[in-house]
Amino acid sequence: MGDNMDFSEHYGNFSENYVTESYGEFDLYYDPLNETSLSEQGHRSIWVLSIVLCSIACVLGITGNAFVIWIAGVKMKRTVNTIWFVNLAAADLLCCVSIPFSIADIILNSHWPYGEAMCKILPSMVVLNMFASVFTLVLISLDRFALVILPVWAQNHRSITLAWLLCGLVWVLGLLLSLPSMIYREIVVHDDMNITLCIYNHLQDKTEGNQSAIKAIHVTRLILGFLIPLLVIAVCYLLIGRRVSSGRFKSQRAFQIILVVVTTFFVCWLPYHVIGLVIEYGKEASQVMARALDPLAISLAYVNSCLNPVLYVFMGQDFKERVRVSLRKIFEKVFSEDVTLRSSVYSKGQSQLSRATNSSEAQV
């Protein structure tokens, strides 16, 4: 095969060599005539759409998340809420910074010109973003749960210092869970094709132990990075919803924004995990199709990193207000502590504390 490899011959393994995380086996000599696969035109369409989505995510994500960090982290008074949103924006910004390398990787038909160090670092940044983002969303949900369900505890323990410590813990856990990506990634040079690939080394080392380790990594990623956070967040908002619907708290726009942000995260990352499972455990025909669609799933995960600032703008004000006020005012309203909620929490906390005191005095 010559230096200028035909698009259809190489694109079949695109998803397995893509700069972000890949899951299963890949076939370097993909057969475009395989009836279970997509046509060459289908691959080209996925190729173009992936570039478009990544480009949009890059431009909006870098500018939007940088603006969020500037507003919530620099211009506004430091609160627990602003710390959560700054941490979420920092995770998304980190991911968006790596997108240009991904776009170049797509354009170069998965050729990896950046060396082995970057092969280990860049894919790991995407995994780190996933864990840091979802763990931050869990913290936000638990924080809202404490404010509504455990107001006395929130009044006594909810602090900026604790928020910073928890955000630090999020990054430590994210880094630890991203380490396998660094360990198992390496570059493979194919001189006959004039191409260098960034892949998992289990694609070269097919020993049973190595294969099992990779599968364990992906299952762990699915459970800790998707299923458990989804369960925790769902339970938190189910209980919050019951309390709000009881009429004891007014429905707050802040809750609506956070719910949409959480829902968007899981919708954007669901295809990534589903396709990964199909590639790892599905039948051969399903694996081929999943590999072909994998770039779209990865691009959709990238898009999630640019959506939050957009959601803050479109949900932070009514439409007429959005026209009249500056973006800074919109963001400040989104990130500010909810006065009505805090008043309700404080009143309920005082009421509970008063009842507890009266009960103690009666017993004496």
Swiss-Prot record:
Record function comment: Receptor for the chemotactic and inflammatory peptide anaphylatoxin C3a. This receptor stimulates chemotaxis, granule enzyme release and superoxide anion production.
Cystine bridges: C119-C198
Any Pfam family matching the protein: 7tm_1
Keywords: Cell membrane, Chemotaxis, Disulfide bond, G-protein coupled receptor, Glycoprotein, Membrane, Receptor, Transducer, Transmembrane, Transmembrane helix
Cytoplasmic compartment segments: 72-82, 142-159, 242-256, 317-364
Extracellular side: 1-50, 104-120, 181-220, 278-295
Subcellular location: Cell membrane
Membrane topology: Multi-pass membrane protein
Natural source organism: Oncorhynchus mykiss
One of the record's GO molecular function terms: G protein-coupled receptor activity
Stated family: Belongs to the G-protein coupled receptor 1 family.
Protein name: C3a anaphylatoxin chemotactic receptor
Domain of life: Eukaryota
GO CC list: plasma membrane
